[in-house]
Amino acid sequence: MAFVIRLGLCWFALLALAGCQTNDFNAESYAELDQRYDVVIRRDVRGVPHVLGATDPDTAFGFAYAQAEDNWQLIEDAMPFYRGNSAVYSGMDGAVTDYLVKWLGLWETVHENYKWDLSPDTRAYVEAYADGLNFYAATHPDKVDESKLPVTAKDVVVGHMLRHLLFYGFDGVVREVNKAERQRDISTPSEAMAVPADAKEITLGGLPIGSNAFAIAPHFSEEGATRLAINSHQPTTGPVAWYEAHIQSKTGLNVMGGLFPGSPSISVGFTENIAWGATVNRPDLVDVYVLEVNPDNEYQYRLDGEWRDLERDEVDIKLTLWGFLPWTVSREVLASEHGPVLRTEHGTYAIRYAGMGELRQVEQWYRMNRATNFSEWREAMAMKSFASFNFAYADKEGNIMFLHNSLTPRRDPRYGWSQYLPGDDSSLIWKETLGFSQLPQVVNPASGYVHSANQTPFNVTAEADNPKLENYKPGHGFQMDMTNRAQ
């Protein structure tokens, strides 16, 4: 793909790159943000923060401040990644992810829909969380890089959007398409498949890794209590290492558990009444379409017998070369009716993926944190803003549940969706996903247990209580492999 490199306007100040960075961070005004919030942070003997606010936004403000005290560098370093300007700080190493953020149009989605897709109480909560980070930065100037400030609520929202994509392996599909040769055949209706062909174990250094969560019903436990074990396997340091906290407000929020630094809500944990754990799953949630390009116009593709125009735009990737030289790389971004488009030496491809245009992840986590019973927790999960993850649930009323959470597309069962798809048929551009009640799940099984260890959702409890694969048409792309921990 052709691109243009332009020397930055600050080329004459090669030794003063900071002069090229502009920001709207007024430390003096941000240092007064604490006057708006009523919150107390206490730490237990292990240093775990217990945050008590008068309202949920008060709690969010204090929660952010506590996280910043413990993990400021991780939070700050993530901001350029979410904004698509990490190459300014890391050079060419960050250019690829910067292009990914811009190619996906994440910020356009947030700018257009932030006010409409997120409820007022969620916006107030996330904005208070951003205030807490900025208050910490303003009162600790020796620890922060002001060129990355201020943090906004939209930064937090985009961060969730991007991380959810990476958790189910979207980036792996993009890397595959960009390889030197085409990796898969184009599917035809005769290649319909009952199960996906390429489910893969999650590995590190060749060894299987992953997480575990299991719930035990009262009638299956010796003491007659509901039990939930959360055994999520994450690194001990870094941006996806668990951070433990307890957050509480006087308006109903009261939850403790683990999260990744920079998250405004608890990801796995418990309240006074309910608890849940999560494990990574790998359903097939990304489809690749091979486009037929007009030989007389490279910006047109065939769809339903007609030539359609590709959407075209140009984005600037700002870099710093050799640690001091600012450059700007201009790159073309294309999109078809299917989704974002990539040109390669072996073809032009459109990518369609679960979660396109979805920004409500922060709201769903918040609703889960506020849930007080099984019904409210399921209502939160029925938002279906998460593209993936398995969940194991338990509560003090004795309910247990396994949920294979995924934005599973409703695909044409005549095609093998683990292959590439012909891009000239609009009927293959799926627009709907399975409803919440249609996802593989187990509620209060007679067996008395459910477990999740990154395995297929069709083997999570006793055989008689498992979801049945035969209830689903081919093409949904459910994960079919077992893991060594699930057997």
Put a short name on every predicted segment.
Residues E112-S119, R227, E358-R367, L469-F478:
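Glycine- and acidic
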Residues S119, G132, A199, I209-A215, ...:
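Short alpha-helical segments and helix-capping/turn motifs at coil-helix boundaries
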Residues F386-A486:
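Hydrophobic alpha-helical segments
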